[in-house]
Amino acid sequence: MRKVIISVIAVLALFLSKDAKAQDSSYDVFNPISKYLALGDADKLSAWFSDDLEITIFSNSNDSSRNQARQIMKSFFRSYTPRSFEITHKAGRSNMKYALGTLNAGGEMFVVTIFVNYMDKDYRIQHIKIERPS
């Protein structure tokens, strides 16, 4: 009986820790997103996409499915091979956050804005915007 109770507590702790991770103020959703932007890995980046999101590249804005957005990002990364990405500013509330960053890709610098929303027990990218600095 004691083993059953310990097993139940362990399983509950696993489920609760996943929810707590996203809401924990020390958890930074932008760490993995930044990593995949710097690597130019559209496949891994798209795991963070919402099912439907807005993607804007150089003033061309599209409401896209996750798969469409992945293809758009793959095309961008083919044209502009990333060398580095650095977050320069972050803000938001517990369920909505945004970050501004600088992407060095293809010999150019780009300003990247990322909006994430807490949905279905995890953060998802709702909008990603890539622009040339003005």
State where each predicted segment sits:
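A short gly/proline-enriched turn/hairpin at secondary-structure junctions
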Residues: E54-N62
